[in-house]
Amino acid sequence: YAVASSEESVDSAAKLGAHQVMFADRPWEMRAPVIEHGRDLHRKYHGTEPPCVMLTEFCVCGTDLPTLEEEARQYQGKFVESNFYHYEFLGEHFAAVKGYDSYQQKAAIMRESGVEGAVDGFMQAASWGTPDKILRGLEDRRKLLGDFELNISFRFGGTPFDVSERGLKLFAKEVLPVLQSW
């Protein structure tokens, strides 16, 4: 497994024959061309079909959609905000760092839209909501990207333990069995 966002890291993952690991940090329509490019590179280097991409994300799951949207905005938002400042996305420094073109793309989007816009983009990509809403989103993602592995976290951005536990248990009960049937 290799995190693969930039052109260089996608190429490295393909050369290694590794599963590309992609984070749910922007709409999947923006990610699809990079994922497909990595698959093409794998075929070129190895003459075989590439392994499934692993999608890594942060999930809020429950039964009351308005409450879940508030929780997702709060906790996924806190995670995005911490990344926003940790990576100093308001700066221009990624443009000069080889291998960080995807960060530069993210930085440009964040400079234009601010933290709120970054949170909106993150929430378009990440799983949050009722089990049915989450499943519909994952089905749409599968149609766009093909089969994938899923690495999902329920505790992030200050999420209280009870909210994390609620989401994990409900996801395991109602979402996971459907995913395992794919």
Where are the regions a protein language model picked out?
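A short, mixed-charge helix-start or loop-turn motif at secondary-structure junctions
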Residues: 20, 120-123, 157
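Hydrophobic faces of well-ordered beta-strands that scaffold small-molecule active sites
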Residues: 1-3, 18-23, 51-58, 148-154
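Long, low-complexity C-terminal extensions of enzymes
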Residues: 130-171
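An alpha-helical appendage that flanks or caps ligand/catalytic pockets
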Residues: 29-147, 180-182
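A conserved active-site cap/scaffold subdomain adjacent to cofactor or substrate pockets
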Residues: 5-35
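Active-site-proximal loop/turn and secondary-structure-junction residues that shape catalytic pockets
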Residues: 26, 59-61, 156-158
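Flexible, glycine- and charge-enriched loops at secondary-structure boundaries
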Residues: 24, 28, 127, 161-165
